[in-house]
Amino acid sequence: MLSDALDPETSNVMFATLMKARRFAPLFWCQFLSAFNDNLVRNALVVLILFKIGSQNGPALVALAGAALVGPFFILSGLGGELADRYDKAAVAERLKFYEIAIAAVAAGGFLLQSVPLLFLALTGYGVIAALFGPIKYGILPVHLDIRELPSGNALIEGATFMAILLGTIVGGWAGAHPDAARILSVLTIALAVLSWMSAKLIPPSGEAAPHLLINRNPLASTLALVRELKSDKRLWSGGLITAWFWL
């Protein structure tokens, strides 16, 4: 029964079981390491802008850093969902995390050169990967988990995300202010990206949910189409608004 999964003792056992299972653990660590890296770079960039480079436009650049990371979600979420349905989710995840290593290399170059434009480019790249990976990390859970395990699986993925945000904020601030910040941050960003990719390679195949789906070449149009589809179902639309309000 689904209610059994909500029992604290049962949930604790299920958490431990999932964290040792290949059908879940690689996804957990892939999400954690990637989100940690995103927020590490963002907060280190904030420190670089405010305390090392210094600029009268500092506050505006800090706000822009947040927009660079979050902005791609508004445009690419629909495309991410289409890719997750058209292709094997595990294969797409592995490919995205491989590309993320190149983005981490750009971030490392930005830290070594103290180049704000390079770091903004990397941060936007991280946002693109995160937007495309989002539908995969949630869509693959029902494939590999039993319905009784879904509440625990969702809780662990969300917990990984928020723990990564917290740690990324702390470590990014500390590393950004360190005298040897450039070297520390360049090593960290690349190491985290490689570990995230290695985790993604261990995610079991999910199969193709909609192998004949045609990918819309206009990512904004696909996102708007998704919004219209959500609005047509009052229950889904209400759930979407509640979730969006939480993230705001």
Where are these regions (language model features)?
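Alpha-helical transmembrane-bundle signature of multi-pass membrane transport and export proteins
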Residues: L2-L248
